Amino acid sequence: KNWASMLDDHVCYFGIVDMHAITVKYSPAELRKNTLSCVAQYIACGLDPERSNIFVQSHVTGHTELAWLLSCITPIGELQRMNQFKEKTAKLGFNVEKCSDLKFIHEGARAGASVNSGLLMYPVLMAADILLYNADLVPVGNDQRQHLELCRDLAQRFNHNYTDTFTVPEAYIPKQGARIM
């Protein structure tokens, strides 16, 4: 409902972020089903495909290409400090705060758990999802605000180091639904 209300005043892009979904264990058949279901839900919620752009992330190669470029200017330490990364690794039994990088890897391997690089790079892919379309306003939940701040930092870093290429986006956090976007 929040997104549908933006269609009159903005050029809107809505992604089915199937590549983000594979940062955790998944079933390919279930992912395909969920992708189609997400498109149907977008339309059922009032997102008019004639007035907005709905895309499947993995079908637009620019997302991964830009994510790679952004990863080359993203320090690993910035990614390891992301709250969502810490929370997800804690669920696997890791404590990012108390482990050196090498100890973190060895302890995880001994315990039979692992943290994949996709989980660590999730916010870089999210930044690519946003910057690819030169978005100036991004609806995010409070839980994603830190990722948007990284996106802003990456846009500014790229623009400073190379050329003014990216729009530095602002967060749009609606009062209603701020945690479920």
Predicted regions and their residues:
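N-terminal Rossmann-like or analogous alpha/beta NTP/dinucleotide-binding catalytic cores
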Residues: 1-127
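Active-site cores that bind ATP or allylic diphosphates and position pyrophosphate for catalysis
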Residues: 86-181
